[in-house]
Amino acid sequence: MPFSEPGKTKFQVDLRRHLRNQGICDNLVHLICEIAEASKYVINAVRTGDLGVAGTSNLYGEEQLALDVLSDRIIKKRLIHSGVVCNIASEEMDEIFQAQADADGLYSVAYDPLDGSSLVDVNLAVGTIVSIYEGCNLLQKGRNQVAALYILYGPRVSMVYSVGRGVHEFTMNHLMEFTLSRENIVMQEEGNIYAPGGLRNKYQEGTEQFVRYLEEKGAKLRYSGGFVPDINQVIMKGKGIFMYPALNGSPNGKLRLLFELNAMAYLVENAGGAATDGKQPILDLEPHSLDQRAPVYIGCKADVVKAMEFVSRN
């Protein structure tokens, strides 16, 4: 069924209805709706929860915040409750959790429960990032995702998802229900915004030259320190590039392939953009471990191609 242009919708389209109109199976509809349901509890935790440390460390040796642990517990519980998930992997878990042994008709989910959680105590936006695959294998290319989404906890709570048929934004209303706000989001070929992560004095020469190129052409620096709000800005404005490059001393950058990069690359590509590690598309990278990291340049196609040109020279 056709939908009105943003701002002209005469009736509200809820998430479940929109998912069913995508022509996907009922189990996938159910799973995405369960994740959306979990976000209601996560946003309550963000608004009212403990901002202290949990006294534990994650797989990467990073000290976990209480909100990280609570958000992870909330989402994991909803995934198990869904009854359609076999394997679960989270940035906060040390290993893959098996929810069910039978893979028939089931999915596996990799997620970052609260990306940017260290920003909560200064009241900046944070988010949840989710990748969904068919079957029980989580160590596969991002190209094989059947769905990806993120939920942004900002002044508004929004959810952006794709099942390979366009990218769509939903906004949580006063009843804590997600209703359609933008459909079939398409990015421009080139942008004028850039969000550069990492310490610039550790940039390798190719990335440094690319940043100078952006500065010289008048691009605006817009970086919050949160991956979800920064990618949301690029997608919603339809222009620009986010980067967290290889650094001197950290050749693989910082961001995790399974828990952060694959989902965002899937969404950006479905919106007409591109994502690369500087050599090949993020979605074509073969994961070998849960903690694998990769550099990333993600956003408008022309900007990403230009970044690759600079990086490949050095």
Curated annotation (Swiss-Prot):
Q: Where does substrate bind?
A: D115, G116, S117, S118, Y223, K254
Which co-factors does it depend on? Mg(2+)
Q: Where does this one sit in the cell?
A: Cytoplasm
List residues binding Mg(2+) 2: D112, D115, E260
Task: Give the GO cellular component terms, alphabetically.
Answer: cytosol
| Residues noted as binding Mg(2+) 1 in the record, renumbered to the chain | E91, D112, L114
For this UniProt record, the keywords arranged alphabetically read as follows: Carbohydrate metabolism, Cytoplasm, Hydrolase, Magnesium, Metal-binding
Q: Fetch the InterPro entries from UniProt.
A: FBPase_C_dom, FBPase_class-1, FBPase_N, FBPtase, SBPase
Q: Which GO terms describe its biological process?
A: fructose 1,6-bisphosphate metabolic process; fructose 6-phosphate metabolic process; fructose metabolic process; gluconeogenesis; sucrose biosynthetic process
Q: Name one GO molecular function term.
A: magnesium ion binding
UniProt entry tagged with the keyword Zinc-finger: no
Comment on bound cofactor: Binds 2 magnesium ions per subunit.
EC class of this enzyme?
A: hydrolase
Q: Which family does it belong to?
A: Belongs to the FBPase class 1 family.
The record's note on quaternary structure and interaction partners says:
Homotetramer.
Q: From the Swiss-Prot or TrEMBL record, give the protein name.
A: Fructose-1,6-bisphosphatase class 1
Organism listed in the record = Geobacter metallireducens (strain ATCC 53774 / DSM 7210 / GS-15)
* Lineage, opening ranks: Bacteria, Pseudomonadati, Thermodesulfobacteriota, Desulfuromonadia, Geobacterales
